[in-house]
Amino acid sequence: ADLSHDPKEISNFIKLLGSHEFVIGSRYIEGGKCLMNPRRLAISKYGNWFIKLILNLNCSEFTNSYRGFNLNKLKSFHLNLIKEKGYSFFMGTVYHICSRKFAYVEIPIVFKDRQKGESKIPKIEIFRTLINLFRLKLKKTLRIK
């Protein structure tokens, strides 16, 4: 709603959902951009890098919420298996999609920083995300669904 994500990209999402179950708008693949202040950019970029490193998944974007789901496949996704809440939900969704081998694709997007206001993410949420990240790593290591 703050136009950080360009609504014109939605048609690309819809087109790709014909052949994929999940589409992720990615700031960190070729063609993608993240136009935000340097501090927020560093937190976002290194946060995504750290998640990718810990979970060892072939994805570049874990924290962006600009995504599309194929509704026919969403029924078999079992959303109740995603225990992550708040902002960790975005990371948890990618983890579950990759671990259950759903067909997904990342497409480049341009993310623009909001023009007014502050980040909506409370600092405690970063701590919760770290706890959820290591919980997901444990699940992956122990091969728990």
Predicted regions, residues:
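The conserved acidic donor/metal-binding loop of glycosyltransferases
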Residues: 1-4
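Short, hydrophobic alpha-helical packing/hinge segments within bilobed ligand-binding/sensory domains
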Residues: 65, 93-94
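Short-chain dehydrogenase/reductase
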Residues: 90
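C-terminal catalytic/acceptor-binding lobe
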Residues: 100-145
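Catalytic donor-sugar/metal-binding loop of nucleotide-sugar-dependent glycosyltransferases
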Residues: 57-58, 81-85, 94-112
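Acceptor/aglycone-binding surface of glycosyltransferases and processive sugar-polymer synthases
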Residues: 7-87, 114-131
